[in-house]
UniProtKB/Swiss-Prot annotation:
It comes from Geobacter sulfurreducens (strain ATCC 51573 / DSM 12127 / PCA). Substrate binds at residues 300-306. InterPro entries: Adenylosuccin_syn_GTP-bd, Adenylosuccin_syn_Lys_AS, Adenylosuccinate_synth_dom1, Adenylosuccinate_synth_dom2, Adenylosuccinate_synth_dom3, Adenylosuccinate_synthetase, P-loop_NTPase. GO terms for molecular function: adenylosuccinate synthase activity; GTP binding; magnesium ion binding. Pathway: Purine metabolism; AMP biosynthesis via de novo pathway; AMP from IMP: step 1/2. IMP binds at residues 13-16, 38-41, 130, 144, 225, 240, 304. This is Adenylosuccinate synthetase. GTP binds at residues 12-18, 40-42, 306, 332-334, 414-416. The keyword Metal-binding applies. Binds 1 Mg(2+) ion per subunit. Mg(2+) binds at residues 13, 40.
């Protein structure tokens, strides 16, 4: 038995969806544990491209149970839209193959309006929110004002909580943000309609996962975003609002830490970031644009162009430490095919002095200078390789050097968007990483 957590080891968009899709073959349950529809997973199945924002990637596999845990925040409208699209494609034939925690917090229309209005008023201090209402929903969760799915299913409880929230939210919208308020009626009936559909998917998911793990079933936990976007361990305040690190898999599902056996971090062979915040290896030249175009670096959720830079070993080494990574899956190695020289950041300096680790102080992080090591490129198409030995020597040397720098074994190498364009060195469900 092995229960595996998959986390992003950089600033998100590392290719977790593809890796989760591959690992799903070996799992019984696939579980989302944090975030919301602010993150997109892009999967390529045969000739079919599927983008999911809420539903776990495992939904494309027959016979797997997909679970959305209590640590996620749920937009009912988006959730229902994804279900409809999947059913239109002939997927999700059994509704009970997809379960949602009864304790999950619900994204309300006022959350989205507040999110957008705040960002509009931020000027140069923009965080880079997707405007999906994720942050304000987590605020209400922590402030104990949130509306959970179990509340939504009880019309009387929902009505009371909605009225209480609107008294406060309308003041914020009108007086502080200069936006229009909501009426009770326009939200209540719409969300009661959502509740009638959601009722088919509600469950005590923590208990289900406990029983499945106890019975020897294999659990796969699918993280969203990345380590450097974690609300506690990321580049605060340029972070998301949830726990993206491996610890979030426990708090976001109700699964015991003792029931987590392997933790795999996903990292691109270079690095990208969306939105504002420090990014020491960012490339603002032709190399950065080349990475963006060849790697199709545009957000699955927002369509925004991603900032691109050379691989940052400091970032991934930090992810190894705070997550307790047992292995790293390296994605998009093929994007580097046509670079004669590839740079790798091995460390930072601040005011001329080397730093031992990532600085927590944002003002320091923004002024860090990367220390680079240059490696020769392989200048050939590697997308046809199916074993590590089939890669060009210079490509193998690049992977091995990254492994040395991050202090963690690389267990998978992705060399293209398709599932078969993957080199599995070690499988966390079958091998001891």
């Amino acid at each position: 038995m092995a229960n595996v957590v998959v986390v992003g080891a950089q600033w998100g968009d590392e290719g977790k969806g593809k890796v989760v899709d591959i690992y799903t073959e070996h799992a019984d349950d696939v579980v989302r544990y944090q975030g919301g529809n602010n993150a997109g997973h892009t999967l390529v199945v045969g000739e079919e491209k599927v983008v999911l924002h809420l539903i776990p990637s495992g939904i494309l596999h027959e016979g797997k149970r997909c679970i959305i845990g209590n640590g996620v925040v749920l937009d009912p409208e988006v959730f229902i839209q994804e279900i409809t699209r999947l059913k239109d494609k002939g997927r999700l034939k059994d509704d009970r193959a997809l379960l949602v925690s009864e304790s999950i917090h619900i994204i309300m229309p006022y959350h989205k309006r507040i999110d957008i209005a705040r960002e509009a008023k931020s000027g140069e201090k923009k965080i880079g929110t997707t405007g999906r209402g994720i942050g304000p929903t987590y605020e209400d969760k922590i402030g104990r004002r949130g509306i959970r799915l179990m509340d939504l299913l009880d019309r009387d409880v929902f009505a009371r909580k909605l009225k209480e929230n609107l008294e406060e939210k309308n003041v914020i919208l009108e007086k502080l943000l200069g936006d229009k308020p909501f009426t009770f009626e326009e939200i209540y009936e719409q969300y009661c309609g959502y509740a009638d559909i959601l009722r088919n998917y509600v469950a005590d998911t923590s208990l289900i996962l406990y029983n499945d793990s106890k019975a020897g079933k294999k659990l796969l936990f699918e993280g969203a975003q990345g380590t450097l976007l974690d609300v506690d361990h990321g580049t605060y305040p340029f972070v998301t609002s949830s726990s993206t690190c491996a610890g979030g898999a426990c708090t976001g599902t109700g699964v015991s830490p003792r029931d987590i056996h392997e933790i795999i971090g996903i990292s691109k062979a270079y690095v990208t970031r969306v939105g504002s915040g420090p990014f020491p290896t960012e490339l603002l030249d032709a190399d950065g644009e080349k990475l963006r175009q060849v790697g199709h670096e545009f957000g699955a959720t927002t369509g925004r162009p991603r900032r691109c830079g050379w691989f940052d070993a400091m970032v991934v080494r930090y992810a190894v430490r705070v997550n307790g990574l047992t292995g790293v899956a390296l994605t998009k190695l093929d994007v580097l095919n046509d670079f004669e020289t590839i740079k790798v950041c091995t460390g930072y300096t601040f005011e001329g002095k080397p730093l031992a680790d990532l600085p927590a102080n944002l003002a320091v992080f923004e002024k860090c200078e990367p220390v680079y090591e240059e490696l020769p490129g392989w200048m050939s198409d590697i997308s046809g390789a199916r074993t590590f030995e089939e890669l060009p020597e210079k490509a193998k040397s690049y992977v091995k050097r990254l492994e040395q720098l991050i202090g963690c074994p690389i267990v998978l190498v992705s060399i293209g968007p398709r599932r078969d364009q993957t080199i599995i060195i070690s499988n966390p469900f079958q091998d001891k990483v």
